[in-house]
């Protein structure tokens, strides 16, 4: 395959070395476990966390005479993913045997797709950033192909002092291998690409993207070169299982290769592993070429053939994807690109926001969801599906601010009460006396008391009007945050003689 370099070297992406600047070239192969209740060629369950060898059929164990039968749901999921990646869907694809030996690969080969994959070239638009001014830079990362293949089993080395055991629960589970083109030029771009791809898969419902459970893993190909020169020799970093580790692995491997080249050495094409504890990669084995696997069509499986009507029916059922939803949020709710990007990153977050924003000010809803709700979720380690503050409750809090029932400060306290204790926001406001003080007489009394207690500050404020804000803060503090801020501000300015 001829690799075409489509990007001009970007000075801000270059890595400074002892002998000049270097450019890192990154491509990825992502193994995404297909969301399906059964495996690719058997009816065994794909449940995560089952007892070892509980979900194994005779096909998965490669018992003599057992033949594979394709799971149509896995085919549909691959097509849906291809459509989500704006990729070419191949109406005819072929399953091949990829021959190699692993102790946890009972067949002695993996059923995969080589020359004729189910999905061809596609594209992912990736937003990198934000920059200091809040802007994003968009890059295009090409998708070379997507093919279906079986996962291998798992070797267990910690069960016995002298023996290793094999768990075949994962054997035969359907994977989509999504191969990107080498279009990324920094660790940040690679992390943004992987984040975007995972978001697309989750929106489509074709992979849960849970990297900590192994249902999405990345093989990262890294090489370095002088700007404008041909691609260098690449090394593959296998099975990186978090987006943060992907970034660390790329940075470590790029530094390693630059150091070797600057010392006059040469890069060996090899497969490496990333050690998160040490923050570095280490050699695993020499990198195989395609001919090492002796691919040939699987004689037990006929070619996979479907027509355009089959594809069109699946396309008609696709959900709104992140890019389309982001554009709609910006247009319909007047959100900034940053806020819209945060809200659409996860499908559940976007759905929550839409419920809160329905019939309300979109910007206010976005601020509460991003700053307060997501902040609380991050602080407590909860998922949005488990939030104690429902969209209806958050919407009610926003309504109470808008109609003047509570102040913005009290609203923050009310959110924490609902988060920690639950309950209806309206009832909590009534029972705890949290309503905003709008009585001008009561507010004026509080203003007079603060001014009387701080005569030195009064003279300073008259000379420097911005200090009026200090008086406003003291009045709000004295009233427990219940005073109407606009009324307080107006009275403070009036009493201090500030226009």
From Swiss-Prot:
Q: Name one GO molecular function term.
A: glutaminyl-tRNA synthase (glutamine-hydrolyzing) activity
Q: Which SMART domains match?
A: GatB_Yqey
Q: Provide the reaction this enzyme catalyses.
A: L-glutamyl-tRNA(Gln) + L-glutamine + ATP + H2O = L-glutaminyl-tRNA(Gln) + L-glutamate + ADP + phosphate + H(+); L-aspartyl-tRNA(Asn) + L-glutamine + ATP + H2O = L-asparaginyl-tRNA(Asn) + L-glutamate + ADP + phosphate + 2 H(+)
Q: Does the keyword Glycoprotein apply?
A: no
Keyword Nucleotide-binding in the entry? The reply is: yes
Give the transmembrane ranges: none
According to its UniProt record, this protein's enzyme class is ligase
> Biological process (GO) annotations?
glutaminyl-tRNAGln biosynthesis via transamidation; translation
Q: What NCBIfam families does this protein map onto?
A: gatB, PRK05477.1-2, PRK05477.1-4, PRK05477.1-5
Q: How does it assemble?
A: Heterotrimer of A, B and C subunits.
> What family does the database annotate?
Belongs to the GatB/GatE family. GatB subfamily.
Q: What is this protein called?
A: Aspartyl/glutamyl-tRNA(Asn/Gln) amidotransferase subunit B
Q: Which organism is it from?
A: Chelativorans sp. (strain BNC1)
